[in-house]
Structures are given as C-alpha cells and as structure tokens.
C-alpha cells in the first residue's frame, strides 16, 4: 500500500517531504486540498475530513502509512528518514541534524510571518537588511562539506534546500556572496531522482503559501 501525504495544493510545509519521498523512491500518493478564494478562503475540503482520519493532532501536512498516522512536518520527515538511515550516524552528525532541523524551522517561520503580513512591504525591507547575516550563518555551518552534516546526505539537507530556494525566490541575489551555498543548491538539484521529479507536472515550486498570504500566494 502506498503512503498517503495530505496537504494543501501549494509548496508550503510539504516541499521537503515531497522531495524526500521522491529521493528515497518511496511509494506514495498525494491528497491535495484546495482552499477557496478571498474573502472567505473556504477550507471545507480539508475541514470535512480533518477529524475523520484518525490523526492524534489533526493538521496539514499528514502522512498515513498503514497503521502509522503522523502529523507535524518534521515528524513526517524523520519518519521517512529513519527508514532510509538519513538521520545521521555519529553523535556529532546527529547534533548537527538537530541544530539545522530547528534552525531551518525558525527561518521558515520568520519568512512566513513577513509574507503573510498586511505590512509586507515594510517588513520586507527589514527582513532584507538582516538576510545576509542569516545566510552567512548557513554558509559557515556548511563550510567545505558536501552536505550539511558531512559527506552523506541527511534529511536536513532537504530542509536546507527548501529554505535556500525559498529565499532565492524572495531575493534572487541572496546567495551570490556565498559560493558554497550556490554549489549546494546546484548539487541537490542534479540528484538523479530530484532532477527527474522537478521535470514532472507533480512538482510544485510555487505557490509558496496559501491564498491568505500577501506575497507568495501564486
């Protein structure tokens, strides 16, 4: 039985999950929910099923794999990663995984707050001012490694790729001063299964966010 990934028909919190499912060659199908247009942003497609799926904390995204029913995007990522030994092996690697997992979520939330705000134009200016410093930290953390944890890819590389690509859409020059990050993005995109997936109609680079967002909703 293929796994079922449920989420809105956007990129959002499912991007790294979809990429990891593709990279690992996992058998899965998607249930994509559509949100209505303004001003109501009707969510009935999702709400009509929300409490009928047997989820402990009903939310999107969710992953159903037989008797395993999982919500929270990072919990889903870790579940898939454990099946394929992509969580780091040594204690040092696991520490780096944990740090980057949480740092990526922080940055993702910061950008989302800007993009969902009615004060987007004002907040964008402030965000762009601090962006080089934030990107520099990612560059330093990667260093000369092939992947963020070492020479072997782990699930946090999928999170890091998502974050960096999001910011390239937000500000296309943001990685210009950081060649190791540009190389990382290029290295990730030429992975055989990732490259193949990106050429399919199933691949969603955009919309980044739901229709409620001020920016990134198309």
UniProtKB/Swiss-Prot annotation:
Q: In which tissues is it expressed?
A: Widely expressed.
Q: Where is the GST C-terminal domain?
A: 90-208
Query: Which CDD domains does the record cross-reference, listed alphabetically?
Result: GST_C_Mu, GST_N_Mu
Chief site of localization: cytoplasm
Question: Which Gene Ontology BP annotations are present?
Answer: glutathione metabolic process; long-chain fatty acid biosynthetic process; nitrobenzene metabolic process; xenobiotic catabolic process
Record domain GST N-terminal: where: 1-88
Q: Which reaction does it catalyse?
A: RX + glutathione = an S-substituted glutathione + a halide anion + H(+); 1-chloro-2,4-dinitrobenzene + glutathione = 2,4-dinitrophenyl-S-glutathione + chloride + H(+); (13S,14S)-epoxy-(4Z,7Z,9E,11E,16Z,19Z)-docosahexaenoate + glutathione = (13R)-S-glutathionyl-(14S)-hydroxy-(4Z,7Z,9E,11E,16Z,19Z)-docosahexaenoate; leukotriene C4 = leukotriene A4 + glutathione
Q: Which residues bind glutathione?
A: 7-8, 46-50, 59-60, 72-73
Q: Where does substrate bind?
A: 116
Gene3D superfamilies, per database record: 1.20.1050.10, Glutaredoxin
Catalytic activity, EC: 2.5.1.18, 4.4.1.20
Q: Which GO terms describe its molecular function?
A: enzyme binding; glutathione binding; glutathione transferase activity; leukotriene-C4 synthase activity; protein homodimerization activity
Which cellular component terms (GO) are annotated to the entry? cytosol
**Name of one Pfam family that matches:** GST_C
Cross-referenced InterPro entries: Glutathione-S-Trfase_C-like, Glutathione-S-Trfase_C_sf, Glutathione_S-Trfase_N, GST_C, GST_mu, GST_superfamily, Thioredoxin-like_sf
Keyword terms of this UniProt record = Cytoplasm, Lipid metabolism, Lyase, Transferase
What does this gene product do?
Conjugation of reduced glutathione to a wide number of exogenous and endogenous hydrophobic electrophiles. Catalyzes the conjugation of leukotriene A4 with reduced glutathione (GSH) to form leukotriene C4. Can also catalyze the transfer of a glutathionyl group from glutathione (GSH) to 13(S),14(S)-epoxy-docosahexaenoic acid to form maresin conjugate in tissue regeneration 1 (MCTR1), a bioactive lipid mediator that possess potent anti-inflammatory and proresolving actions.
Give the quaternary structure. Homodimer.
Which family does the similarity line name? Answer: Belongs to the GST superfamily. Mu family.
The identity of this protein, by name, is Glutathione S-transferase Mu 4
């Amino acid at each position: 039985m293929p796994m079922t990934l449920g989420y809105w028909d956007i990129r959002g919190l499912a991007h790294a999950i979809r990429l990891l499912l593709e990279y690992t060659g996992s058998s899965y199908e998607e249930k994509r929910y559509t949100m209505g247009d303004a001003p109501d942003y009707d969510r009935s497609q999702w709400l009509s099923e929300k409490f009928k799926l047997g989820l402990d904390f009903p939310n999107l995204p969710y992953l159903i794999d037989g008797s395993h029913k999982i919500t929270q995007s990072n919990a889903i990522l870790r579940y898939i990663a454990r099946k394929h030994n992509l969580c780091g092996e040594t204690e040092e690697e696991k520490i780096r995984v944990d740090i980057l997992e949480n740092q990526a979520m922080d940055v993702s939330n910061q950008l989302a707050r800007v993009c969902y705000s009615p004060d987007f134009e004002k907040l964008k200016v402030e965000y762009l001012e601090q962006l080089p410093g934030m990107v520099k930290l990612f560059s330093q953390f990667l260093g000369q490694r092939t992947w963020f944890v070492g020479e072997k890819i782990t699930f946090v590389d999928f999170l890091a790729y998502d974050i960096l690509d999001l910011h390239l859409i937000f500000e296309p020059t943001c990685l210009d001063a950081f060649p190791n990050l540009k190389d990382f993005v290029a290295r990730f995109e030429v992975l055989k299964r990732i490259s193949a997936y990106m050429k399919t109609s199933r691949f969603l680079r955009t919309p980044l966010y739901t229709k409620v967002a001020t920016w990134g909703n198309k």
